[in-house]
Amino acid sequence: MINDKILIFGYGSIAIKHKKFLTKLYPKKKIFIYSKRKIKIKNRINKLEDILLIKPKHVIICSNTKNHFKDLIFFENNFKKINILVEKPLFDKIYNYKFKNNKIFVGYNLRFDPIMQFIKNKIRNKKIWVANIMCGSYLPNWRKNIKYYKTYSSKKNQGGGVVLDLSHEFDYATWFFGKLSKKFSLIDKVSNLKINSEDYCNFYGSAKRCKHISIYLDYFSRIPYRLIFLKGKNFFLKANLLKKKNNLF
């Protein structure tokens, strides 16, 4: 990777974080930014043709969720054997398409959190009876200096809503227990937030390694929390991801 070029595709709040970390890790490397916004930043490009000239080996797609599929198609049609990291969620809906030319990764980085690694190790050979997973936050506090009702999170047609925005919970539940089977779910817009995407989700299902799984998500909790409760035979675990604490009994 020493001489490979990096491209950040899109330049919102998450992309800014990626650039910050990459600059720190690789201070001498050229990091290109693709954005149609008129922003003053080094190595910015605003035409897709320029990407073909740059020939990046590593790409991070940080565009709006609704654009992820067409953005990936662009790289699929024009590049081979490059590494592409797509910010979660991968898509806003299911597409019947198989990508073959490049390696594609999705940014579900919670799997690498030490607490999550601890839980994964502890439940490896256990049958969990019940899993209660909860994540509540307040959308207006998510992005500094940006009006929340102008962000993609507030707009259903741009891939916003708690189901996609907070899909880390569905990802790590699948990672822990296997493919989820839905029994029922309640998804709604219930608060007074100025958005047209859903701000509430209550999912109930099961998986191979857990009989009962509930996942609760919302955009309107003034006091944020991210909690996991797992219960089984001679086993009880509570994890608080925001406070980076876990208790095992």
Label the predicted regions.
Residues 164-165, 170-243:
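Contiguous beta-strand/loop segments that form the cofactor/metal-binding neighborhood of enzyme cores
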Residues 51-71:
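Rossmann-like NAD(P)-binding element
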Residues 58, 69-111:
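Beta-strand-loop-alpha-helix segment that lines the small-molecule cofactor/substrate pocket
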Residues 1-41:
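N-terminal Rossmann-like dinucleotide-binding module
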Residues 41-51, 101-104:
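Active-site regions of enzymes building and remodeling cell-envelope glycoconjugates
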Residues 42, 57, 129:
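Conserved acidic residues
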Residues 113-184:
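Predominantly a Rossmann-like dinucleotide-binding segment in NAD(P)-dependent oxidoreductases
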